[in-house]
């Protein structure tokens, strides 16, 4: 199944689409995040929630593989590999969304500050998003990954969407504006 990417500089015109993910299995959802160290990370819903990294986000990924070439997409792992729970497979999760936590929201787990977040929609069970934390998105060490069971989304189920970190002051301004 192919995923194509057009590019735009003005959001009025787009380039012709080019293959971006060209694999035999289905890819239905993909999210990307650029880290301060210049690496791009991507989480995709294929047969698992698959995590990859590259320095060239335009590289075409033809198969899931580990490579030392920084200009190709290199396989980091799947949520099942990293967290060891079969309920993280294609049958349970989709809609991954990567993000960076605000400094005040970074939790320490296993003695490691977990700066990054990954949310996935538990579509098969109709439960909405389930959150995860990572100290290092490029790490295959299970100690750098954890389920974020302490995050409370309230009663309203959260489904496919985007994460926009805001400060406490921004949150309060939104609350004040829309309180009534």
Predicted regions and their residues:
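Carbohydrate-active catalytic/glycan-binding domains of CAZyme proteins
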Residues: 1-180
């Amino acid at each position: 199944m192919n995923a194509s990417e057009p590019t735009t500089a003005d959001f009025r015109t787009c380039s012709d689409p080019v293959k971006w993910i060209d694999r035999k299995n289905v890819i239905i959802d993909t999210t990307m995040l650029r880290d301060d160290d210049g690496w791009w990370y991507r989480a995709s819903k294929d047969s698992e929630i698959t995590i990859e990294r590259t320095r060239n986000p335009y590289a075409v990924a033809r198969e899931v593989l580990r490579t030392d070439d920084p200009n190709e997409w290199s396989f980091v792992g799947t949520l099942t590999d990293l967290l060891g729970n079969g309920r993280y497979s294609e049958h349970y999760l989709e809609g991954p969304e990567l993000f960076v936590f605000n400094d005040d929201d970074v939790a320490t787990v296993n003695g490691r500050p977990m700066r990054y977040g990954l949310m996935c929609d538990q579509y098969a069970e109709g439960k909405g998003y389930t959150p995860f934390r990572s100290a290092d998105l490029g790490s295959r060490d299970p100690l750098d990954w954890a389920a974020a069971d302490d995050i409370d989304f309230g009663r309203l189920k959260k489904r496919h969407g985007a994460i926009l970190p805001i400060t406490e002051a921004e949150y309060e301004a939104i609350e004040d504006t829309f309180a009534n």
